[in-house]
């Protein structure tokens, strides 16, 4: 079950934490385009176009995919869940 450890966190806090991870500790913006984050990199998929769901993002971030490195052990489970939440919502906007 995702977000099990984040039950006390509001949706806004989760979104903001996810954006912070996307831009900073996860360094996602270095490779992925996502309008909400102001990132326009095109090394990885354009997240605005593919609009990945939360589970797909969690799997990709944890395990890596293609040239994207696995972030399990680098990011905490909470950070992975937050960035997945943020990315799935921001990509829909």
Regions found by a protein language model. Name each.
Residues 1-2, 34:
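Extended, folded domain segments that form the structural surfaces/walls around functional sites
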Residues 3-23, 56:
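Electrostatic cytochrome c docking/interface patches
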Residues 7-10, 46, 76:
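Serine/threonine-rich low-complexity intrinsically disordered regions
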Residues 26:
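Cys/His-enriched microdomains
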Residues 61, 74-93:
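C-terminal capping alpha-helices of c-type cytochrome domains
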């Amino acid at each position: 079950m995702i977000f099990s450890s984040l039950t006390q966190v509001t949706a806004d806090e989760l979104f903001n934490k996810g954006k912070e991870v996307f831009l900073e500790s996860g360094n996602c913006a270095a490779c992925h385009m996502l309008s909400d984050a102001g990132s326009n990199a095109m090394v990885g998929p354009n997240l605005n176009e593919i609009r990945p769901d939360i589970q797909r993002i969690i799997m990709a971030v944890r395990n890596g995919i293609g040239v994207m490195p696995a972030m399990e052990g680098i990011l905490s489970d909470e950070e992975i869940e937050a960035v997945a939440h943020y990315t799935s919502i921001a990509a829909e906007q």
